[in-house]
Amino acid sequence: MIQKNWQELTKPNKLEVISGDDPKRFATIVAGPLELGFGLTLGNSLRRILLSSLQGAAITSVHIDGVLHEFSSIPGVREDVTDIVLNIKDIAIKMPGDGPKRLVLKKQGPGKVTAGDIQTSGDISILNPGLVICTLDEGAEIRMEFTVHTGKGYVAADRNRAEDAPIGLIPIDSLYSPVKKVSYRVENTREGQNLDLDKLTLQVETNGALTPEDAVAFAARILQDQLNVFVNFEEPRRVEATPSIPELAFNPALLKKVDELELSVRSANCLKNDNIVYIGDLIQKSEGEMLRTPNFGRKSLNEIKEVLAQMGLHLGMEVNGWPPDNIDDLAKRFEEHY
C-alpha cells in the first residue's frame, strides 16, 4: 500500500538531449512524460539549483604592478583600472581542486590584452581566451597576478577582501557558477490514453566548464541528496525462497545492466535512449550501429570499447540464446556472479 504513493506515478521513460552549435555550452534537454504538475515542480527546482549551487572557479582578487587601488589609471593603458576589473570579472576559468591558485599575465604594447594572455598550468583552462581585458599603447606594459578559488554562486568583492590583504590587492566580485543561463517550459503530452501529462524542456547554457547535460545531472543529484532527509521510513522487503540457478549458454556478466558501467552521462543517456539495457544488448551492436545513435560520437565509442575490453568483451559479438526469457529475473539471480 505504501509503495503505491510513488510506484503508480508516471515517470519519464527517456531523457532527450538536443545539442546546440557548441555541445559543450548549449543544449536543450527534454524529459517526459511526467505527472501533471511535476513539470513545473522539477523545472523550477532544477533551474534554481543550476544557477546557484554548482561548483565552479572564479578570480577573487587581482594585483596590478604599480596600482594601489581600483580608482587608479595606468600610463599607456587606455582603460581605467575600474574598467579592467569589470572585464576581469567576466573571465571564465576551469580549475580542478579547491585552490587557491595564482595566475600571472605579462604583456607589452601596443595591442589588446586578452584572457588568453594569462599564463596557466596544465590543470587550469581559460574558457573565453578572446575576452579583452585592456588595450596597451606603444611602449606600455602591464603585469597582473590573479588569485583563483573554487566555490558556488555569487560572492561580492567585499567578502573577498581579506583583513590582512597587502596594499594594491584588489578584490573582485566572483561568479562561480559554470551555468550562465537556464530557462524551462512545460507542455502537455500524452502516454497511451492518458492525456493529462507534462513534458519538461530545459534550455541550458554553460561557460564550457561543464556540459549542459552534466550540469543538469549534477543539479538532479543535489536535489536528490537534499530530499533524502525527508524520507523517514524503510520500504518493506519481500522475502522469497532462493530459486535454483539455471545453466546459461552465455557469460552471466552479460546480464549486468549498462548503467552499472560508470560511463559518462552522455554515453549512458545515448544507450538509454537507444533502449540498450544490458551488456548483452550492447556487445551485439557493431561500431557502425553505435555511431548512428543520436548524439553518440567517437569519444563515447572509445569509452565503451575500453570498458568492455576490461571485461574481456567487445562490440559486434554474437550471443546464442540472447535475450533469454525472464531476463530481469535472471539478472537478479545471477547478480552474485558479476
Curated annotation (Swiss-Prot):
GO terms for molecular function: DNA binding; DNA-directed RNA polymerase activity; protein dimerization activity. Its EC number is 2.7.7.6. The keyword Transcription applies. GO terms for biological process: DNA-templated transcription. It comes from the Bacteria. Residues 250-338 are annotated as: Alpha C-terminal domain (alpha-CTD). One of its GO terms (cellular component) is DNA-directed RNA polymerase complex. The keyword Ribonucleoprotein does not apply. It catalyses: RNA(n) + a ribonucleoside 5'-triphosphate = RNA(n+1) + diphosphate. Keywords: DNA-directed RNA polymerase, Nucleotidyltransferase, Transcription, Transferase. InterPro entries: DNA-dir_RNA_pol_insert, DNA-dir_RNA_pol_RpoA/D/Rpb3, DNA-dir_RpoA, RBP11-like, RNAP_asu_C, RNApol_insert_sf. Residues 1-234 are annotated as: Alpha N-terminal domain (alpha-NTD). NCBIfam families: PRK05182.1-2 (NF003513), PRK05182.2-5 (NF003519), rpoA (TIGR02027). DNA-dependent RNA polymerase catalyzes the transcription of DNA into RNA using the four ribonucleoside triphosphates as substrates. The N-terminal domain is essential for RNAP assembly and basal transcription, whereas the C-terminal domain is involved in interaction with transcriptional regulators and with upstream promoter elements. Homodimer. The RNAP catalytic core consists of 2 alpha, 1 beta, 1 beta' and 1 omega subunit. When a sigma factor is associated with the core the holoenzyme is formed, which can initiate transcription. Belongs to the RNA polymerase alpha chain family. This is DNA-directed RNA polymerase subunit alpha. It comes from Methylocella silvestris (strain DSM 15510 / CIP 108128 / LMG 27833 / NCIMB 13906 / BL2). The lineage of its organism: Bacteria, Pseudomonadati, Pseudomonadota, Alphaproteobacteria, Hyphomicrobiales.
